A protein has these predicted regions:
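Short hinge/gating elements
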Residues: 41-45
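DNA polymerase processivity clamps
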Residues: 1-31, 46-163
Length: 163
């Protein structure tokens, strides 16, 4: 193809990893701690499964973000019921409360998310509908496309239910 192949040298120590290529050196500090066991989380062990129109959900979340100032960390509150998903956000600018028709299996759930992360996940899926898998208000949710070739994990945020 005429493109030259570049060599990347990777080395690491107990605390750092180093990538060297061309005239560039990238050093990153390794982080210690407990991490989610993704393999266990990706099992079909969920409490709530939601099928929803991707475009409706994305448009609703986009509208909600108009009420949040840049840098303000207001979560979007999602209340999942039998046939409806209610999305709420409240800020100094105003408030929004919208409902979207869904197909739900499992339990009702009240959960909060950073709207930016939901938007990032939904924008890359081409399907008309998406499936959202949830365990509880403290556990990550998974958004999957129809072929399950794309899985997006989003951590929930704490919120004041009265907000």
């Amino acid at each position: 193809s005429g493109e030259a192949e570049n060599v990347v040298s990777i080395s690491y120590t107990k605390n750092h990893i180093v990538f060297e290529f061309d005239n560039t050196i990238v050093v990153s500090r390794l982080i210690e701690g407990e991490y989610f066991r993704i393999d266990q989380m990706l099992s079909n062990d969920y409490e709530t499964k939601v099928r929803i129109n991707k475009k409706e959900l994305l448009n609703c979340i986009d509208r909600a973000t108009l009420l949040v100032k840049e840098g303000d960390k207001k979560p979007i509150i999602i209340n999942i019921g039998d046939e409806l998903m209610e999305l709420k956000i409240k800020s100094q600018i105003g408030s929004m409360n919208e409902e979207i028709m869904i197909t739900k299996e499992g339990k009702d759930l009240l959960i909060g998310f950073n709207p930016k992360f939901l938007i990032d996940a939904l924008r890359v899926i081409d399907d008309e509908e998406v499936t959202i898998y949830l365990m509880n208000a403290k556990a990550p949710c998974f958004i999957k496309d129809d072929e399950e070739s794309y899985i997006y994990l989003i951590l929930p945020v704490n919120f004041n239910a009265a907000a």
